[in-house]
Amino acid sequence: MSATIIDGKVIADQIKDEVRQQTDRLKRERGITPGLAFILVGEDPASQVYVRSKGKACDEMGFHSVTERLGSSVTQEELLHIIARFNTDAAIHGILVQLPLPPHIKENTIIEAIDYRKDVDGFHPINVGKLVIGQDCLRPCTPAGVQELLVRSGNDPSGKHVVVVGRSNIVGKPIMNILMQKQKGANAVVTIAHTGTRDIASFTRQADIVIAAIGKPEAITGDMLKPGCVVIDVGINRIQDPTAKNGSRIVGDVHFASAVKVAKAITPVPGGVGKMTIAMLMKNTVRAAEGNVYR
């Protein structure tokens, strides 16, 4: 058996096309241009790359975007003041503070300061709570992207046993809450395994769908999978490889070479879930601009 490759770029492009259509309609019918504000603190190279990628996506969608670049010495109060300004700016419909933040700034305080109606990352406690109880909200981008990958690739999770490996607030927990909802594209039986789970393989071998988000390179191997399962690899890890051009390469949380021989379908890294995260950010932003989520 050799798994079908689930191409995240193809599915992300489908979603972006839909967002462009929504954006054109908003501009034409209501005179609204979706606006997204990025706040970047410090000089972390990875964060700078992420913000540039997101800004480029905004341009492709026809959004208005602004980037506030702050030094790593910025105080928490100064950052809160900037967030408050964007909260009241009618031209800004989404606010994204790029994480991680410097140690002297409390991430939870910053996240909670964002108007939940502009929280396009889906991290605000109000949005987390609404997600848990099944109310409409702006959902975290990566978990929402995982659901879209499953549904649009013909691997609807309804009635399936899904094992999520990882319990982070950003990925693991929200994926669980999304896939167990009583709604189309969900209705799954969800098990979470994590670093405290004694025998992860005993759970993953039972799964129809395995979602790996544990943050450990190639931790899920082919012998840990049930033949014919679907594997979604959320991990992004850089490992040393002397044969690679730059001495390193990017891998996921799944050992692709062994898993591809067992699974029915699998996402690659790169080229899988990562493409979906930005697409779902664009979708959240246009939904926030439409103003229908919290009516």
Language model segments and positions:
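Rossmann-fold NAD(P)-binding glycine/threonine-rich loop
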Residues: E107-H124, V128, G235-Y294
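Short, well-structured alpha-helical segments in soluble
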Residues: E78-A90
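Short glycine-rich, flexible loops that bind phosphorylated cofactors or substrates
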Residues: P103-H104, E218-I220, I239-Q240
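Glycine-rich phosphate/diphosphate-binding loop of Rossmann-like nucleotide-binding domains
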Residues: V41-G55, C137-V230, V234, A244-V260
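Anion-binding alpha/beta catalytic cores of soluble intermediary-metabolism enzymes, centered on
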Residues: L96-V162, F203
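Short beta-strand segments enriched in small/hydrophobic residues
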Residues: T33-G42
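Short beta-strand elements in bilobed, periplasmic/extracellular small-molecule ligand-binding domains
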Residues: L36, C58-S72, A186-I192
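Positively charged, low-complexity intrinsically disordered leader regions
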Residues: M1-R30
